[in-house]
């Protein structure tokens, strides 16, 4: 379109939009933010607002949509949650100051990963932005949180990239717009940048300038292998600078993270353990929602961080444990005090980027004074000593804020009444002029009545006409000569005098001057606080850590969590362990033991559907995870050896986006585990092979279990419905059979949820179907077919020798077919043993005993 065909205002808009083609532009016009053309169409659809038109361009109506500026935050929040970025274009010039449209410019860019405004953020979630820079060997990751000042980098590989992004829970991902950019499982929140922005040389130059250092060796970034990490960090820092229109001063150094710091968990494991999100995508009931007794939002965010980053450093874990133990008698008063603490972390972030509001500073002041009053007995905990020593360091900042900010300032700076009385003499004088105007008006009214003798004379004010003297119609003709007529009404006349006009000018000027001076003083306070940011961030981190540690103490005291012990040898020993989430959802929870060590590394878990196998396996993993956060655990006792990773393969569904079936997803997750699990890993495998035919599934389950035993040698909980696998302990001493017990009462079943030695006798599938409400007709049909299949299997057992033709890895190694036969023999022996177990010889009559003998003989025939 030609510029001559559009208005000057539209020319201005198009020029701004050309610089932000990948973003929605909120263009300020009076009391609205307007959007035009395609932006208007998209915004109308996403925000459910009216799409209209304004004028024409090249003969076509210009589509337009808008939102009120005072409600913009709620609309921005919705757009950000949808992964959209928005350029905020404000009026920065005076209306009517010159020819053409009022001057406008983009003052900030709101993106999903660079939010600082509390209205746009979830209180209990950390908002991170991640930059991804690939090369042939490594992928460099850099991530930051503008709310906390976190700034870290790491080297990873393509196969672990999605797991890292799942761990970081990135709100926005920066990728180079190049052919070698990695393909991500998620497409939401992805921002493409020119590939040159990820250049290592440019990144190092920007980073060294920002941190004021000669090189990045002090951050652990040295050598060519770190080039992609440096490039990612540089691209990220530059992106933050561009979106915020300034270089943030609160990023807390740059640290290089390694795999050895935390227990590894892939995306599937985090999902299956439901750490912060249920399998259905809800926030509750999860491990996080169940444990979160934190008094502050900072504490809740740190708790989520600790749960997703279980430590491997035993010294750091023990330091947390000692603090938890020391707080056991102090956590209640501590949490009561912490409830009065504002979100210092996010207030500090808003100070850093220059958009803190008056009440942010008031809340910060009150919180710093409150923290300084925390009095704890460290009881030998060095961590508590360190944390509580931080708070007095901020008293000088709190005192500066007490002097500068009113006890209860206005919400918005533009409304005035923010700076405290006595802070600045000129502001006090301007306020005196405004606040004592009523006295002047009363004095003037009394003086003028006495001078003129006019009884109806009143001195008043309104926003349209300012100050005026009002006389009734009957007395208006007697007005003195120095009264200048200002307005005529039906029953009155309004006048102005030189004295009143001078006062009006003084008051209105004082108001404008006071607002301008308050803004200047407030900006000065914010600027002075920049130097205090490191100490404020330390206080925020210390308060959050105290909050989480006191929460751990509350859990230990109120939910009977115990302090786990750590061993240097391979062991997972748990006495009467409980699932921390499930036990809060049910009236009675059955506790269970777990014993894995160098002799028994794989627990083969069988039992009925709904018997509790998946719950038990998750329970073990969650207890191990919690122990490594420093939290006490739901058990009577626990001893845990070295753990490097936790893997889970529990349940699966079709991945339609990647065109992968349920079975393909299952096999992909299984393959990942077999390739990455080590002797120090904990592996949970549930129903491997169930997504294919019986023989295929059995063969795969056998192979996977054997691989875990012989190659990975991991601690493994292997749940299966293939009873044929219960032979494994005969061939592998490191495997042990355990089962979830159930009790049959007639045609009904009671699940005991108790772990017991040995394999299960049966699966009780039809009994579970009955509990699920299947029609009686269908249940009878199922039972009939089951009986037929069992009889057929018994009559045709040699057919199972199909497996005997399978080559084994070693000549002397038993093959699957032989194990199937042996497993069936054990299964039938179990049936006979169960039948005998039910008999009570002392209570049988001779006739009943003879009848039972014939029944047992028939049973032997059916299983032989």
Curated annotation (Swiss-Prot):
InterPro entries: DNA_mismatch_repair_MutS, DNA_mismatch_repair_MutS-lik_N, DNA_mismatch_repair_MutS/MSH, DNA_mismatch_repair_MutS_C, DNA_mismatch_repair_MutS_clamp, DNA_mismatch_repair_MutS_core, DNA_mismatch_repair_MutS_N, DNA_mismatch_repair_MutS_sf. This protein is involved in the repair of mismatches in DNA. It is possible that it carries out the mismatch recognition step. This protein has a weak ATPase activity. Keywords: ATP-binding, DNA damage, DNA repair, DNA-binding, Nucleotide-binding. NCBIfam families: mutS1, PRK05399.1. GO terms for molecular function: ATP binding; ATP-dependent DNA damage sensor activity; damaged DNA binding; mismatched DNA binding. Belongs to the DNA mismatch repair MutS family. It holds the Pfam family MutS_III. GO terms for cellular component: cytosol. The gene is mutS. ATP binds at residues 607-614. This is DNA mismatch repair protein MutS. The lineage of its organism: Bacteria, Pseudomonadati, Pseudomonadota, Betaproteobacteria, Neisseriales.
